[in-house]
Amino acid sequence: AEVVEPSGRCTAKTTSNEIYAVTMMMADKRNNVWYCRAEKGDIRETIFSSMINTIQLMGLERMFVWSLSPFQITCLQTGAKCYFSGINGKTDDDMTATKGFTPNGNTLALCILDESDQVKHFNHITAWESTAYRFLLPHGKMVYAYNPPMNRHHWAYTFFGDKVKNGASRIYATWRDIYKLLPIKTIQQIEKFAKNDPEYYRYWYLGEPVNFKGMVYPQFNREKQTRDIFEFFAERDRIVELHIGLDEG
C-alpha cells in the first residue's frame, strides 16, 4: 500500500510515521524499516536523530540500540532493524543509489521517504521503489511524506498526484489537527503569520503552493487594473489584432 502525506509544517507527520515504525519493529522480527531522504549527508542530523528522539519520547530507549556506521537502529526485543539511506543518484538518470540494498531476512514492513519533494528527480524515487518492492511484505507500506513545494509546477505535484489517482491513500494534515499538543509559543507564532502574512502562512503551515509563477500577483485589483477595451473604441471600430505582454518574476 502507498501512502502520500502532503502537509504543512508542525503537523507531526514525521513523528507519527516514526511511532508507527517503532510499533511495527517491536511486533515482529520481519518488520524491518527503510527510512530514507534525498541526500545521504543529511541523514544523521535529520531522520536518524529524529527516530532516536521518537524512541526516547516513547520511553523505549532500553529496547533499542543504534550505530552510526552504518546508520542503523535495532530492536532488541525482535531483532527488526531500521535502515537509513539517501536515494539521490549522481545525475537525473542515475538509478544505482539504492540498487544493492538488502534488508535482514529479505523483508520490509515499512519504507518511508521523508521530504520526498527534495529528491532531485522522480527517477530516483522509481529506482528506490523497485528495490523496496522486492522485499515489501504483503502488509507493508510505502510512505511519501513532504511539504508541498512553493512552485505549483514542481514535479512532485504530478508524480504524487498520479499516485493518489491510481489508488494511493492521501493523508493531509495541518497544525490544527494537533493543536492541543503544540507549545503555546508555537501556536502564537503560527497565528501571527496567519494574521500578518497570509501568503506565507498558507505555504508554510497549510502546505499550499503560493509562489507567483502561474499566479496573478496578490496586489492585482481587477477593479483598478482592468479596463473594458470597448471604452477606447470610436463608433463602429473593431479589434483587428490582440497583443499580450507578460512579465514573470
Language model: regions and residue ranges:
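ASCE P-loop NTPase helicase motor core
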Residues: 118-195
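Short beta-strand/turn micro-motifs composed of small residues
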Residues: 37, 113, 146
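Hydrophobic residues in beta-strands of the RecA-like P-loop NTPase core, especially within AAA+ ATPase
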Residues: 108-114, 246
